[in-house]
């Protein structure tokens, strides 16, 4: 066996065992969203259109492409997902993600807005 084939065999073996042990993953949730940001996706499995929300934006009314169409998300911040009429809210914490959020709670199909921090910060709905 020549050196080239030996290197290929060694590298393949290392990659194989890394994947088996879970130390190497191609899952985007392993990367996560940066601190202070939330990634919203229009399709399951973190695909489709992506909206990047930053807590410095404060209250955000979702655009038409995402209002009622948050299929998956990755959060790097504590935020509150909100539906205004009738009011519903879900507390999301930093590090939380879901690859099929719309199917889990069906809330992704009703969501209107994001508010930074805790859901207890909500006083009244916008007019």
From Swiss-Prot:
Glycosites: 54, 118
Name this protein carries in UniProt: Spore germination protein 2
Organism superkingdom: Eukaryota
Zinc keyword on record: no
Predominant location: secreted
Keyword Secreted: yes
One GO location term (cellular component): extracellular region
Species in which this protein is naturally found: Dictyostelium discoideum
Cysteine disulfide links: none
Secretion signal span: 1-25
Gene name as annotated: gerB
Localization terms from the record: Secreted
Keywords: Glycoprotein, Secreted, Signal, Sporulation
